[in-house]
Amino acid sequence: MIQIDGMAITRGDAQHGFRVALPSLTLEKGEIGALTGLSGSGKSTLLEMIGLILRPDELTHFQLGDDLIITQAVLSNEQAQLASLRAEKLGFMLQSGGLLPFLTVMQNIQLPRKMLGLTPHSAWLDHAIDHLQLRPLLSRFPRQLSIGERQRAAFIRAIAHEPALLLADEPTAALDPHNAQALYALIVEMVKQLDISALVVSHDWSLVERFGFSHYHAQLQGDGSVFIKQ
């Protein structure tokens, strides 16, 4: 599970800064949350803070997992500890997929496990590869895949090491409506199977509502935005 309270950052200088704030967010195991809002409202900025990439200016509480409190490590910007947490506890899925072009699909998928010293294969991973119909594509390179195939491969890579939290930045942005719905259905199924949490940035409110994601929407307030649970 993940619990965050009092997270905020101001981008820009003091006179023309834009403040992005998250008063509270809680996601249980098996639960998916969505960050929505207008372009420029700070969705990606917030995801970078939650992903331990961007240091917040303010933070009251940050719990990652059942009993791992990382508030002080985040505020102190302890890079070695944060890098270890990112590698072990978080999985990232980018708009473009983010697959390394010089690695095959299988090598891309196995990369997070190898970096953590895990065996490259697991029974669960083999099941997921078959379930997402990626087995015939494992020896191909990303350039040889369709957009939908790349996103499926990127999703499996993001959760191959069974992280506590999956973070996905507009994972359906390049997909047509049919493939977008299919990808979200796969994310829902796999998140429940792994009993992890997930947080997605999405511009598609209809899909967020259709799948019943917990919904945190950016409300513009003065010189900034506040993400409030709907």
Where are these regions (language model features)?
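Short coil-to-helix segment of the ABC ATPase nucleotide-binding domain corresponding to the Q-loop/switch region
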Residues: 103-110
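Conserved catalytic motifs of ABC-family nucleotide-binding domains
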Residues: 162
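Hydrophobic anchor residue at the start of the ABC signature
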Residues: 155
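ABC ATPase NBD coupling module
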Residues: 69-91
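Conserved ABC ATPase "signature" region
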Residues: 121-137
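Conserved ABC ATPase signature
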Residues: 141-151
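Catalytic Walker B motif of ABC-type/P-loop ATPase nucleotide-binding domains
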Residues: 166-169
